[in-house]
Structures are given as C-alpha cells and as structure tokens.
Regions:
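Internal intein/HINT superfamily modules and their associated LAGLIDADG
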Residues: 1-143
Length: 143
C-alpha cells in the first residue's frame, strides 16, 4: 500500500516535497476528500448579526503551499470554485498553510463535490456528519 501511495505523490512526514501526481480525473473528488479527511476540517460557527445569530460555514485543507496550490487548481478545474490560501507556517524546508472555502455557498459547493458518489466505507463518519449538519442548518437559515 505504501508503494502504491508514493506513486501518486503521497509520502510520509510532511517535508515540503509533497506533490499530487498521476491521479485519474474520475477519482479526483475522492482523492481530495481523502486528503481533507486526513488534513482538513469543517467548521460551523455562529456570528451575531445585529439581532440574530447566523451560521458561518468554513471548510479547510492544511498542507504545504505547493500541494495547496495544486488542490486549488484541481477544484477550480472541476467545479469552478476558488478557495483562498493562507500561509501560516514557514520553516527552512517548506511553508505550510490552509486552503479555505468560507461562506455558505463556497463551502457547500466544495463539500457537495467531495461527498458526491461517496459511501460510508470511503469517508470519515464524523466529518460526513458535519456535512449533513451543514445541510440541515442551510435548509433552516438559507431558504
């Protein structure tokens, strides 16, 4: 399995040399979901807007900048969605950051794409449940 993953650019211990390569296009959303399951998060926070508390949605992937730019390009190509990259860590060997999809529309478009055609054997249950919670909250607040 280790050998199989290295042919796609997946290597242990982040060091700034990570890259994404040779992933068949038809599996790209599944690959990105798996990457996000390992190094991503889904946030639902409530912010006060005058008289009401409104939900704010955010989905993130953390990695080295090189991989984040590749993922950003892949997502732009597949669903015409561009997330924002924030650099938060620089070392001698690499810089790391987060690719963020913030807001109800952007976060949902990204999450719908990565969870489309997935099943419970292909995803982390607790992250998928957060996605389902997103759907419920969106239905309630953004009709």
């Amino acid at each position: 399995m280790f050998k199989d993953l290295t042919q796609y650019g997946i290597i242990p211990r982040k060091n700034g040399r990570e890259t994404i390569k040779n992933i068949p296009e038809k599996y790209m959303s599944h690959f990105i979901r798996g990457y996000a399951d390992g190094d991503g998060c889904i946030h639902i926070v409530y912010l006060k807007n005058y008289l009401h508390w409104l939900p704010e949605f955010k989905a993130e992937i953390a990695s080295c900048t090189k991989v984040l730019k590749q993922i950003q390009k892949i997502i732009k190509k597949h669903i015409d969605l561009e997330g924002k990259i924030y650099i938060h860590k620089q070392t001698k060997s690499h810089e790391g950051g987060k690719l963020i999809f913030a807001g109800a529309i952007r976060a949902m478009k990204y999450l719908e794409w990565i969870y489309k055609d997935s099943n419970e054997s292909m995803r982390l249950d607790y992250k998928y449940k957060k996605y389902l919670k997103y759907l419920q909250i969106r239905e309630k607040h953004f009709k």
